[in-house]
């Protein structure tokens, strides 16, 4: 945190910048205070803490100021945050330690078990981005994958398909769907009705996984769409909030 803030100060005309830090919804008050104090010690003039799905919703262009409820699923690298928002606040939320990095791990394990081939995290991420999907494809995508043969210890190249990657990550995708269902089950019926009307918005890098929006829509029976720029929603929301702070 200290290194990051030093970089900001070096590029800014302000020696003590205002700082907004986004955190998962399941963070404790003690953890929030620790983050805030650390940021203040490193030179923050004023430090604000906001929950990431709220910031993502604002960055996605959702109007959370009205009584009508909105629902956002923010799928980051390490956590997925699911929140129902109304009147500029979070009504109910769930946070699970499963997201984009989990899909990468799933792919590594699948290829290791099926092909006895060891690949790295970077390769797994490339596979996820290029042919990753949670829907069955009639016309499969294929990709060559290079790694180390666990039987011989030598380099080896195999070809994997999009349907294989679907098989690899389906359980993790279903866990995100299950968490979203739990959120909808625990909110007031009136709020659930609002979400049926307005739909669910997906943000974060994980939102780009092919077919995930359709899977959630099919399983939950609620319209689901990916934000226009899912990768930058949190950054854009952070800027909007800071611009409106006094």
Residue ranges and their predicted role:
Residues 1-75, 83-201, 207-246:
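Nucleotide/phosphate-binding catalytic cleft detector across ATP-hydrolyzing
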């Amino acid at each position: 945190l200290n290194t990051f803030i030093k970089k900001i100060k070096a590029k800014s005309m302000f020696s003590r910048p205002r700082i907004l830090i986004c955190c998962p919804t399941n963070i404790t008050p003690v953890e929030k205070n620790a983050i805030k104090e650390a940021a203040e010690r490193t030179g923050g003039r004023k430090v604000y803490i906001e929950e990431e799905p709220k910031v993502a919703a604002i960055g996605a262009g959702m109007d959370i100021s009205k009584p009508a409820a909105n629902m956002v699923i923010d799928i980051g690298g390490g956590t997925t945050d699911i929140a129902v928002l109304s009147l500029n606040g979070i009504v109910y939320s769930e946070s699970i330690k499963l997201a984009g990095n989990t899909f990468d791990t799933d792919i590594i394990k699948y290829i290791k078990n099926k092909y006895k081939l060891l690949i790295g995290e970077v390769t797994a991420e490339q596979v996820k981005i290029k042919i990753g999907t949670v829907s069955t494809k009639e016309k499969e995508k294929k990709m060559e994958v290079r790694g180390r043969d666990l039987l011989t210890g030598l380099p080896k190249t195999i070809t994997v398909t999009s349907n294989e990657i679907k098989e690899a990550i389906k359980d993790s995708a279903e866990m995100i769907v299950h968490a979203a269902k739990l959120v909808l089950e625990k909110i007031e019926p009136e709020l659930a009705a609002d979400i049926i009307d307005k739909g669910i918005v997906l943000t974060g890098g994980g939102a780009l996984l092919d077919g995930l929006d359709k899977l959630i829509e099919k399983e939950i029976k609620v319209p689901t769409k990916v934000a226009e720029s899912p990768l930058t929603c949190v950054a854009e929301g952070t800027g909007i909030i800071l611009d409106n702070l006094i």
